[in-house]
């Protein structure tokens, strides 16, 4: 079991690293071109990389199979993600969570995935309320985007939970057939 936890953590770390590199480069280019203030980019970089390196410390101190890593990933990336969706103009920024969250299926923990889904949807709702109230993004297109963001995330998490349920059932059936032999 620890071998599979370690493999899941390593795969999650790789995706977190790749996505952090991509977003850092993308937002760095935008900041250099004046799209975002440099002060926002500094906050962006800190929120992106500090949690990643804290996760690295967990790996070194507690080992690659530690359950603490997935919590570090979810909390650290979640804070970073919430900052991004509140500060970017892109209506598709809510999807930046999907590559990382889709890997959480590897942990095959339905309750954990449901809790992540609730937290993710709440962060998008907070962002949408912020954009509506503070930034004044109230057009019909904005309202449609808000609805589609929440609906898309809910459907993704429903599919993630269904996938986990299926994986757990198939593992149980496989284990049962092995025991029967």
Regions flagged by a language model, labelled:
Residues 86-91, 108-111:
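Transmembrane helix interruption/hinge and helix-loop junction motifs
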Residues 66, 105, 112-117:
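Alpha-helical transmembrane segments and their helix-entry boundary regions
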Residues 66, 70, 74, 94, ...:
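Residue-level signature of transmembrane alpha-helical entry/exit and packing/kink sites
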Residues 12-89, 96-102, 120-121:
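Hydrophobic transmembrane alpha-helices and their membrane-interface boundaries in multi-pass
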Residues 1-6:
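Short, Lys/Arg-rich, polar N-terminal cytosolic tail immediately upstream
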Residues 82-89, 124-149:
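Interfacial aromatic-anchored transmembrane helix boundaries in multi-pass membrane proteins
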Residues 142-154, 158-181:
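HAMP domain helices
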Residues 28, 53-57, 125-129, 157-161:
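Membrane-embedded alpha-helical segments of multi-pass transporters/permeases
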């Amino acid at each position: 079991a620890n071998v599979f936890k370690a493999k899941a953590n390593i795969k999650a770390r790789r995706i977190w690293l790749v996505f952090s590199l991509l977003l850092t480069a993308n937002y760095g280019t935008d900041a250099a071109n004046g799209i975002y203030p440099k002060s926002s980019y500094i906050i962006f970089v800190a929120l992106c990389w500090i949690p990643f390196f804290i996760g690295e410390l967990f790996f070194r101190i507690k080992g690659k199979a530690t359950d603490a890593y997935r919590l570090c990933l979810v909390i650290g990336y979640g804070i970073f993600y919430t900052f991004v969706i509140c500060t970017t103009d892109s209506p598709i920024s809510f999807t930046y969570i999907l590559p990382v969250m889709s890997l959480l299926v590897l942990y095959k923990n339905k309750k954990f995935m449901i809790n992540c889904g609730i937290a993710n949807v709440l962060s998008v709702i907070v962002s949408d309320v912020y954009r509506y109230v503070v930034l004044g993004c109230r057009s019909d297109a904005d309202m449609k985007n808000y609805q589609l963001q929440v609906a898309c995330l809910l459907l993704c998490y429903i599919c993630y939970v269904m996938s986990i349920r299926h994986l757990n059932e198939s593992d149980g059936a496989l284990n049962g057939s092995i025991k029967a032999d």
